Swiss-Prot record:
Organism of origin: Neurospora crassa (strain ATCC 24698 / 74-OR23-1A / CBS 708.71 / DSM 1257 / FGSC 987)
GO cellular component: cytosol
EC number annotated for this UniProt entry: 4.1.1.23
UniProt name for this protein: Orotidine 5'-phosphate decarboxylase
Family recorded in the similarity comment: Belongs to the OMP decarboxylase family.
InterPro entries on file: Aldolase_TIM, OMPdecase, OMPdecase_AS, OMPdeCOase_dom, RibuloseP-bd_barrel
């Protein structure tokens, strides 16, 4: 898709990742830019393996070379859903150890109330272990706003651990932190509250009853309290040097374009993605796309599309979204680059994706996973993708 950006590149294409930190509107985007500079890596591994043990082993081996690990939890056999010791928790420990962010490629698409539950509840509780997720916005921009609300609510509650205790007494409603906590306690109260009567006789010979009420209460304690027991071993709690741990904020990538042959995501859809991103900068980090969309206009994407809205030049120029692009594949030394996998996936080299098309992070899957030496191949991709980024800056300087 040709755009005016080819002759007038957006400022974000010229700046270093370190320089773009200053203009970032999302804490996680700022962190990722700094992490990329520290590791000199703009590589994401698409870890599409079939078993949890293979996923964890691959993340541990390739972690030093990447800044993002992309997962599909629902295709993993043996995924342990335990919130503290399960697969998600172990991935989070590896992310801290090696310095990368976890991107769950969930592609949410549904009404707002449904995606909120899919994101923060259910068996996987994606929000708790994945820094980043993504969405297909065919369901509308309101879905993005709903996910942002769910992430914010989770973020506000995360500094505290909920402690449940059983005591004898009368419950007081204002002891509960919020409406949700009160609802949870009410459910517990139904289970454990018992009215027990024992028959005795008073001194005058009359029967009397002694009534005992057992009450469940909840208190909140800071998550860093020394009284809380660690659920991951100390060896797994190593932290990558050179940068602090990632912020607890959560981020969304909007699926704006795909590389599969015959993809139905046309220019009108991509333009709606751009509008949704600009309206939700506090939650949207950027895009999964095939080109750089910073500063893009409706005329460049869908000139005949009448949406009744307009974007000012100032709004377009303020864009500083991060871009990730899949389908990256390097040929063996001395061979030409492959064009695809025969299943609709179209491949691109790091230079084409990062230097020419302007993406920030190259996503690589089978090129690393199926290699004889995945860590060594990951390093080869890291070097090539980083050089493509340096070449882009030099070319546009």
């Amino acid at each position: 898709m040709s755009t005016s950006q080819e002759t007038q590149p957006h400022w974000s294409l010229k700046q270093s990742f370190a320089e773009r930190v200053e203009s970032s509107t999302h804490p996680l985007t700022s962190y990722l830019f700094r992490l990329m500079e520290v590791k000199q890596s703009n590589l994401c591994l698409s870890a599409d393996v079939e078993h949890a043990r293979d996923l964890l082993a691959l993340a541990d081996k390739v972690g030093p070379s990447i800044v993002v690990l992309k997962t599909h939890y629902d295709l993993i056999t043996g995924w342990d859903y335990h919130p503290h010791t399960g697969t998600g928790a172990k991935l989070a420990a590896l992310a801290r150890k090696h310095g990368f962010l976890i991107f769950e490629d969930r592609k949410f698409v549904d009404i707002g109330s449904t995606v909120q539950k899919q994101y923060t509840a259910g068996t996987a509780r994606i929000v708790e272990w994945a820094h980043i997720t993504n969405a297909d916005i065919h369901a509308g921009e309101a879905m993005v706003s709903a996910m942002a609300q769910a992430a914010q609510k989770w973020r506000e509650r995360i500094p505290y651990e909920v402690k449940t205790s059983v005591s004898v007494g009368t419950p007081v409603a204002d002891q509960f932190a919020d409406e949700e906590a009160e609802d949870q306690v009410e459910e517990l109260r139904k289970v454990v509250t018992r009215e027990t009567s024992t028959t005795t006789k008073d001194t005058d010979g009359r029967k009397s009853s002694i009534v005992s009420i057992t009450t469940v209460t909840q208190t909140y304690e800071p998550a860093d309290s020394p009284r809380l027991v660690k659920t991951i071993s100390e060896d797994d709690e190593m932290v990558f040097p050179g940068i602090e741990e990632a912020p607890l904020d959560r981020g969304l990538l909007i699926l704006a374009q795909m590389s599969s042959k015959g993809c139905l995501m046309d220019g009108k859809y991509t333009w709606e993605c751009v509008k949704a991103a600009r309206k939700n900068k506090g939650f949207v980090m950027g895009y999964v796309a095939q080109q750089n969309l910073n500063g893009i206009t409706k005329e460049a994407l869908a000139p005949s599309y009448e949406d009744g809205e307009s974007t000012t030049e100032e709004e377009a120029q303020a864009d500083n979204f991060i871009h990730m692009t899949p389908g990256c594949k390097l040929p063996p030394p001395g061979e030409e680059a492959p064009q695809g996998d025969g299943l609709g996936q179209q491949y691109n080299t790091p230079d084409n994706l990062v230097n020419i098309k302007g993406t920030d992070i190259a996503i690589v899957g089978r090129g690393i996973i199926t290699a004889a030496d995945p860590p060594a191949e990951a390093e080869r991709y890291r070097r090539k993708a980083w050089k493509a980024y340096q070449d882009r800056r030099e070319r546009l300087a």
